[in-house]
């Protein structure tokens, strides 16, 4: 069962958007050998931490597990790629 973060964090998506998001998660799972549930948990944790410091557009947030060449170029390793639109930075007072 996929975690539906839109219910937890507010704004609801229409059926088309949900189906598209689920398909993306399945494809990511196939490429990186991680479950869609794991990726949703990572996404939720990233949102939680970043939200302490800035207001982000959760609807446009895109996090993917991909594969890339290692630094030595001899192997392929998983990589976490995040595109996180920032609406504003919170005043931390520090």
From Swiss-Prot:
Gene3D superfamilies: Cell division topological specificity factor MinE. Keywords: Cell cycle, Cell division. Pfam families: MinE (PF03776). InterPro entries: MinE (IPR005527), MinE_sf (IPR036707). The keyword Thylakoid does not apply. It comes from the Bacteria. Belongs to the MinE family. Prevents the cell division inhibition by proteins MinC and MinD at internal division sites while permitting inhibition at polar sites. This ensures cell division at the proper site by restricting the formation of a division septum at the midpoint of the long axis of the cell. NCBIfam families: minE (TIGR01215). This is Cell division topological specificity factor. It comes from Acetivibrio thermocellus (strain ATCC 27405 / DSM 1237 / JCM 9322 / NBRC 103400 / NCIMB 10682 / NRRL B-4536 / VPI 7372) (Clostridium thermocellum). The lineage of its organism: Bacteria, Bacillati, Bacillota, Clostridia, Eubacteriales. The gene is minE.
């Amino acid at each position: 069962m996929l975690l539906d973060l839109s219910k937890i964090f507010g704004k609801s998506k229409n059926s088309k958007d949900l189906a598209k998001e689920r398909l993306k998660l399945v494809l990511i799972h196939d490429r990186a050998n991680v479950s869609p549930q794991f990726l949703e948990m990572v996404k939720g944790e990233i949102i939680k931490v970043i939200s302490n410091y800035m207001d982000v557009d959760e609807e446009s947030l895109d996090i993917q597990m991909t594969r890339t060449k290692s630094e030595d170029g001899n192997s392929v390793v998983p990589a976490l790629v995040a595109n996180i639109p920032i609406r504003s930075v919170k005043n931390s007072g520090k």
